[in-house]
């Protein structure tokens, strides 16, 4: 079943933004994450996938301390789906991924991806395999409505014209 009103292309790929605050070693907000993800798993069953149509989940995001220091990048790739379950308006997708860390890529990292009300996505990565790099909370993201994505792309294609228009309107 297609996601109602959400961005989805002809191959069933859905994408969205990572926008999350992660706790530091003291359990307090210490890091900001910002980036993107895309997947084909949303609103599908495990039987939807096979060797010629594998489950996909990829993400890339920047991570910086709240003061702007220690900026670095992470990628999540090589998703392997092992289980799908649903409870209420939340669907959970479990599997393993490869994630880049300072020391290099770490393979076979357990992940749980949750989709809530088709608007919010969370990524929970195994803290042991990642040396607690992402703190003690899930990484949060959003699933934008297709209309919002189209509007954003339209504004981006207009380039400086959009910025000039907003600047002129704010000066009135």
Label the predicted regions:
Residues 1-56, 139-155:
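N-terminal segment immediately downstream of the Sec signal-peptide cleavage site
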Residues 14-17, 93-95, 123:
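Generic recognition of long tandem-repeat/solenoid scaffolds
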Residues 26-102:
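Predominantly extracellular/secreted and cell-surface proteins with exposed
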Residues 68, 104-106, 122, 132:
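Intrinsically disordered, low-complexity acidic/polar segments
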Residues 96-102, 116-118, 126-128:
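Solvent-exposed coil/turn segments that connect beta secondary-structure elements
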Residues 106-124:
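A short, surface-exposed beta-strand/turn
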Residues 119-167:
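C-terminal partner/receptor-binding element of secreted or periplasmic proteins
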Residues 170-172:
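Short, solvent-exposed mixed-charge patches
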């Amino acid at each position: 079943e297609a996601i109602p009103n959400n961005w989805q292309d002809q191959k069933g790929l859905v994408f969205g933004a990572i926008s999350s605050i992660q706790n530091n070693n003291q359990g307090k907000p210490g890091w900001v994450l910002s980036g993107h993800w895309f997947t084909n798993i949303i609103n599908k069953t495990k039987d939807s996938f096979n060797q010629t149509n594998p489950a996909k989940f990829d993400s890339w995001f920047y991570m910086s301390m709240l003061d702007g220091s220690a900026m670095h990048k992470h990628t999540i790739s090589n998703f392997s789906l092992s289980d799908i379950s649903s409870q209420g308006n939340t669907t959970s997708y479990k599997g393993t991924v490869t994630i880049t860390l300072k020391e290099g890529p770490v393979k076979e990292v357990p992940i749980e991806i949750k989709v809530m009300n088709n608007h919010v996505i969370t990524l929970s990565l195994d803290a042991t395999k990642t040396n607690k790099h992402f703190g003690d909370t899930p990484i949060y993201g959003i699933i934008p409505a297709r209309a919002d994505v189209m509007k954003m792309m339209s504004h981006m294609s207009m380039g400086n014209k959009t910025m000039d228009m907003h600047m002129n309107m704010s000066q009135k």
